[in-house]
Amino acid sequence: MKRNPSQVDLPVESILNRLDPYVFGSMSLGHEDVPFETRLSMARYAMERCGWFHTSHKYGSTMDVLAQAFREWPMRIPKCIFKLSGDSLDEVRRQIDLQLEKLGVEQISIGQLHVGGALAADFNAGGKCLDGLRAIKEEGLVGAFTLEVHPWTSHIALDHLRGGQGRDIIEGYSFYFNPLQRYALNDLFALVLETRRPILSIRTVGGGPVEKQAARPERPEDFMQKRSAELLPVYAQSDCANWVDFSMNFVLSQPGVICTIGSCSTPAHLDDYLAVLKQERPSFNPSLTRKILALQTKWSDEKDVHAPEWSM
């Protein structure tokens, strides 16, 4: 399975063109209820099989695990997408320095930028922060930036995309995108597709098998259980082998999607992801795609657009 590069507008030299369809999400390496050596073994297993990792210094002890794995196996260090956030450019720079020093690498291949506060205002006004981000790239600290999107920050990305400022800096958009979630609100998602901007989809399987999520007791606050119950009949109509197969085939078939970022804690789970990439099969069923996208449009209007910050 390969992405279709004709679906996006990217400079030939952009490092985003070198992304693999699947990026190993490292969050589970920070789960301290699992022995350190077990997590280290998982990191080595992923390094042997995956050319790209996604990580953050906010993922518990994930960076301790990765730092040791990178020291032990420097010839297999993957390219990395790092989460970067802050209300000022100085804060973003501090996070860059912190993470580079922690992992002992010289460059953040892709910086997934979450802007807030004064930085967000300056960013959308075409202010000095854009020159600061350009300088970071020119120094070789970051190969490319994408803008991280949540329902409560979609307006920032929408204003940025409409205004066109800093398009040379922000090369794509990173957000939850799987059969159960699409965190770019409807108007932003439509404009991203219209302008052929690259999408880095996050959270490949949306929290786990749809059957298990749908089987949870109904509770008003459990919106994922409700969504799973609505999606379950669509999933049942597919010929996919399992939920991983269904989720990856759906999202990687969508216009603009250049990779999917999925976390896993066991070698067997990672093998499930990689097995899907080896398939030679037609595109995802168009009828099922239309049904999923219709549900996501409805969910965006009903729930996502009203979501308080970090509530989902």
What positions do the PLM features span?
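Aromatic/hydrophobic pocket-lining residues that form the small-molecule binding cavity
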Residues: 39, 66, 92, 126-129, ...
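Structured C-terminal cap/extension of enzyme domains
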Residues: 15, 37, 44-47, 72, ...
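Active-site-proximal loop/turn and secondary-structure-junction residues that shape catalytic pockets
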Residues: 28, 57-61, 84-88, 112-117, ...
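N-terminal binding-site loop/beta-alpha segment at the start of enzyme catalytic domains
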Residues: 1-78, 131-132, 138
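Hydrophobic faces of well-ordered beta-strands that scaffold small-molecule active sites
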Residues: 20-25, 51-55, 78-82, 108-113, ...
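Active-site mouth loops of central-metabolism enzymes
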Residues: 25-37, 81-91, 116-123, 231-241
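Glycine/proline-rich, positively charged
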Residues: 33, 44, 48, 90-179, ...
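Hydrophobic packing residues within well-ordered alpha-helices of enzyme cores
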Residues: 66-69, 156-161, 270-273
